[in-house]
Amino acid sequence: MLTDMEISSRASLTNVAELGAELGLLPEEMLLFGSTKAKVDLSVQQRLAGQSRGKLIIVTAVTPTPHGEGKTVTSIGLTQSLKAIGKKACACIRQPSMGPVFGVKGGAAGGGYAQVVPMQELNLHLTGDIHAVSSAHNLGAAAIAARLFHESRLGKVEFEAQSGQAFLDIDPAQIRWHRVLDHNDRCLRQVQVGLGENNGPVYESGFDITAASELMAILALSANLADMRARIGRLVLALNRQGQVISAEDLGVAGAMTAIMVDAIKPTLMQTLNGAPCLIHAGPFANIAHGNSSIIADDIALKLVDYVITEGGFGSDMGFEKFCNIKVRQSGQVPSAAVLVTTLKALKANSGIESDTDINTPDEIRLEAGFANLHWHINNVARYGIPVVVAINRFATDTEAELQWLINAVNQTAAFGCEVSDAFSQGEAGAIELAHTVVRAADTQSQFRLLYPDDASLEAKLSTLAEVGYGAAGISLSDEAKQQVREFTSLGYAHLPVCMAKTPLSISHDPIQKGVPKDFIVPIRALVLNAGAGFVTALVGNVMTMPGLGIKPGYLKIDIDEAGEIIGLG
């Protein structure tokens, strides 16, 4: 079989202007970037304001493993197969961060014959949205540092006289706004800034990856440009010496930060291998952020097609949970069905049983033990009142006997149905039955419900998420986290939903605990207020907001050939 890059480079593409017209966009609603991608202007939202809406399908997965579960492959394959059976469908996915592309995970365009193409354009830069987020974010960091510098050297009276601005009295120890970078770079996690003569005052800071920026979450959760401007104004950059919030609006930088992102708020239109449309927009990670593509992209697609396929990052305890409790809570766009992706390899890897046996060989004991993880995720999705279809992403090494065993086991659960997907190897022809089953599931009446109400306390929300959402015995709050609960409550933010930043490699906080962990306590070391995005992040265990590169990073394989074409992406 050809590599992903070879398949992408040999694809016959529809001109993006024609693709947009087929989708229902007007020429003036598209800003073309060559023939392969286009920005979609938000004026389409107003034009289609009264349009009936299609059905939203959320794709999630079991607990991820190093073998790859194929969630994006399934999302794109399902979109292709829906088109093949005569349904008007559109995928809505996140823009890949270059951190994972050059790190361990690789690209995020799907794979095999279920890809968004050209995949190299999607995985590297695309239309520059992530760079815009980085620039806007770092402008905020530069502005707060500059304001601190000038206020410190001049004092209140002279600063106000010279600048015509109010003295903010910034507390250097309470500057909450780091800088960001779209690469994995662990040495920047903790830094001191302001060193050297006339550069201070010195204060502790750090860098996060851009996907963890609150601006990225704002991009994904905004309803329109005006909403994004208002949210950016609410960003909490620091506290003053009296413990009061200093926002981007207070600093006078919110307008300029928004100006940098006026094009980034427009989704990018691309296509799958069989010419189905795909809107790519925003890229928050699901472990350290809320892990879903934008509300705007979903809104546009739902007004143009019958079925919108979107996905949440990592397992159902991560991106799917945040899709429900954060994204849907803010958008009101309720899903009609869910697709839960699994593989035989994933179940064996999640069994918790150490084995020297090749994971590609039949292993009844590990498969049956690992099924508990899939069963947990089925029940977790069903908890939200959404019909769930299990998609088994087939690998070439899978045996029919093990596949049939798994289908029979799934049919004894709360799942609506179970289908084997060959989208990776067969493209649109490989997920036809999955498409039919998903259509039937979406035609049933979803009874969507949230996990907790807005008016619950922050501590109650954290406890509910840990105990009901993960099956934990409870939570433990550090002294810092307890103080932050009190602080955020006193500032009027207790109504916000919570976003757990934890490992994706286990349902629990501990990546070593496989399968369905029990009797564990979720340790919450700190909270982060995201007043603009509209949620409070809980940092669980040792999760980092700036990843690091491994000993064999992905960039080692990436180069250009003699013709100047990119090679090694996948």
Curated annotation (Swiss-Prot):
EC number(s) from the headed UniProt entry: 6.3.4.3
One MF term in the entry's GO annotations: formate-tetrahydrofolate ligase activity
Reaction(s) catalysed (UniProt annotation): (6S)-5,6,7,8-tetrahydrofolate + formate + ATP = (6R)-10-formyltetrahydrofolate + ADP + phosphate
Gene Ontology biological process terms from the UniProt entry: tetrahydrofolate interconversion
Keywords: ATP-binding, Ligase, Nucleotide-binding, One-carbon metabolism
Pathway: One-carbon metabolism; tetrahydrofolate interconversion
InterPro entries the record matches: Formate_THF_ligase, Formate_THF_ligase_CS, P-loop_NTPase
Entries under CDD domains matching the protein: FTHFS
Binding site residues for ATP: 65-72
Family: Belongs to the formate--tetrahydrofolate ligase family.
Name used for this protein in its record: Formate--tetrahydrofolate ligase
Gene designation per UniProt: fhs
